[in-house]
Amino acid sequence: MWFLPAALPLLPLLLLLGQAPPSRPQSLGTMKLRLVGPGSGPEEGRLEVLHQGQWGTVCDDDFALQEATVACRQLGFEGALTWAHSAKYGSGEGPIWLDNVHCVGTESSLDQCGSNGWGVSDCTHSEDVGVVCNPQRHRGSVSERVSNALGPQDRRLEEVRLKPILASAKRQSPVTEGAVEVKYEGHWRQVCDQGWTRNNSRVVCGMLGFPSEAPVDSHHYRKVWDSKMKDPNSRLKSLTKKNSFWIHRVNCLGTEPHMANCQVQVAPAQGKLRPACPGGMHAVVSCVAGPRFRPPKAKPGRKESRAEEMKVRLRSGAQVGEGRVEVLMNRQWGTVCDHGWNLISASVVCRQLGFGSAREALFGAQLGQALGPIHLSEVRCRGYERTLSDCPSLEGSQNGCQHDNDAAVRCNIPNMGFQDQVRLAGGRSPEEGVVEVQVEVNGVQRWGAVCSDHWGLSEAMVACRQLGLGFASHAIKDTWYWQGTPGAREVVMSGVHCSGTELALQQCQRHGPVHCSHGTGRFSAGVSCTDSAPDLVMNAQLVQETAYLEDRPLSLLYCAHEENCLSQSADRMDWPYGHRRLLRFSSQIHNLGRADFRPKMGRHGWIWHQCHRHYHSIEVFTHYDLLTLNGSKVAEGHKASFCLEDTNCPTGMQRRYACANFGEQGVTVGCWDTYRHDIDCQWVDITDVGPGDYIFQVVVNPKFEVAESDFSNNMMRCRCKYDGQRVWLHNCHTGDSYRANTELSQEQEQRLRNNLI
């Protein structure tokens, strides 16, 4: 980050926020810290603490940016850029001294923060936390002057908001224009407009979830201000005479992700002897909302091409504006390595996508891993760039990045007020219950229930997102065991149908007049939310490498016929004479999410399959289809049901799920379930299909029976050439790995190279 040099006459009264309270000398605390491990510089590494003469580690449970900020300041840096969980910088040795550390963010030492106590932990060294500090260090003389002048070390800017002044601004949602108010030491203050710049406005807008700022009609606002100052009964007039009403001066470069990183002068240089903001008024800011948050018929801030919008995207985030960062290069989507990843680069991504600045820059695949290429590493944005492609970077393959280094972001988004229009009632925890919404009924805002007709996982996902509770683990249609809020049990919303991308249930399609076939009561919609979810992805390359044709005798297909794994024409054959032509392949399904994939049904619902000699826990886990080029189905796999297990896991990770002996079923995070090409029903029966060009398609979790953090990567497609005797699969890829308008041309090129046309 970059800071303007402080003017020496103002040093006693400057608050350099974001570098936060200046660090005190190490001797003032009883705790010593160090950073160790394979970091790229002295500002990052595994965090270790010296206690009772022995170095130990800190567990990553509940560790977040405010804890990292305290640690970095204690180490002499200006603040933290981010932190790393799961022993990114290697597992430590010795004791785990601290667990569940909780800081406000203003402390000068970690020993001033809450925790379980010295050595009280249920963690292992695989959970050792690391930090990445701002490489800029404190300058001793400046730190001492600021520290001595400010006294208590807990002064900081906490929040920023816009107070709408004009009637037109008050009617908008979100509020995009108004006077800047800053929460400082627990109280809201207004900011003097003297010296206020567009750079300051840009930072404020970014914090509020807006990608850019717009010019303000200062002359009009000045007239409004002067009229209030002339009113002898104006409360504002008396308040402005108090220095405690003002933040005297703000100076930002415009690249900062938070006003806490700007220079802020709380009071004038002469303190109480000189009034703050003499002759000035409150600073007014106008922000430009991103496309998803603009009011109807609002004009865009600038012309945005579809190509520009689609060069970066976020995946696997629970909330809008968060996710794993993926960029489009060479017509293929790939990830960004977290080496050198920080808040400034993350903010460029957020603004490019129409959000505000970055609230958090995450690394270590904290929001899940991807398959496919890693396009970028060592991204070094300055903060001025319009797109991530404008920033200096290296190729991801140049410095040993793996997908456990996938970078992610959490962006600031505007407050739309949607979270106040939904609530859960009657559940055993705050994360579950009957869904109650606030809607307008006959001109009056009322709370009521949602009809569970057609209520599914997509709708539940939107509800959990609106509540700020992450993903939906279950969409519940029968809620008789949960008592709703008295007076809110009547159904006020029915026919809800969501695509899954909406910000709120109120944005989904629904009935005009309420029509609920079940009425009220036990059939109100409910949800159970969770902060993490699995993410299943098919290994497309393995499908392409293992596909082949087999003419299998009917005498070997009795079990498969019994399980309905053959096309209907097999029923009319003279068993056991003849054969079926099968397109066989192996499928390997990876769980790249942050939670285990578990079957929806409990053990009581599992089905014993005599042919396979084990239980199947899920009715439809994947669909296998052969399609014409226009999408019509010509053949399909008929695998009746599936057993879920950890076929393989990465080195050092133990398999947890197995089909044998009525074992627990599922797919562990990081592991994969493999269905070999030579097992029963692992095929598509193409006996009745003629030669031609086709699309081979596999869809995982096709009915959305189990929640995932990302459903867009559940489809795998290949181009298929069948000449009546041989089959070729080529250009196999997950459904979202290529940009749509380049997919066809790439397939054409591949076929030309393979001499298939």
Swiss-Prot record:
Protein's UniProt keywords contain Transferase: no
Disulphide-bridged cysteine pairs: C59-C123, C72-C133, C103-C113, C192-C277, C205-C287, C252-C262, C337-C401, C350-C411, C381-C391, C451-C516, C464-C529, C498-C508, C559-C565, C611-C659, C643-C649, C671-C681, C718-C732
Modified residues (2',4',5'-topaquinone): Y675
Named cofactor requirement(s): Cu cation; lysine tyrosylquinone residue
InterPro entries on file: LOX-like_protein, Lysyl_oxidase, Lysyl_oxidase_CS, SRCR, SRCR-like_dom_sf
Residue segments, region Lysyl-oxidase like: 534-737
Cofactor binding, per record: Contains 1 lysine tyrosylquinone.
Alphabetical list of Pfam families matching this protein: Lysyl_oxidase (PF01186), SRCR (PF00530)
Domain SRCR: 33-134, 160-288, 312-412, 422-530
UniProt keyword annotations, A-Z: Copper, Disulfide bond, Glycoprotein, LTQ, Metal-binding, Oxidoreductase, Repeat, Secreted, Signal, TPQ
Posttranslational modification: The lysine tyrosylquinone cross-link (LTQ) is generated by condensation of the epsilon-amino group of a lysine with a topaquinone produced by oxidation of tyrosine. May be proteolytically cleaved by BMP1.
GO terms classed as biological process: collagen fibril organization
Localization of this protein: Secreted, Extracellular space
The name this protein goes by in its record: Lysyl oxidase homolog 4
Source organism of the structure: Bos taurus
Lineage, top ranks: Eukaryota, Metazoa, Chordata, Craniata, Vertebrata
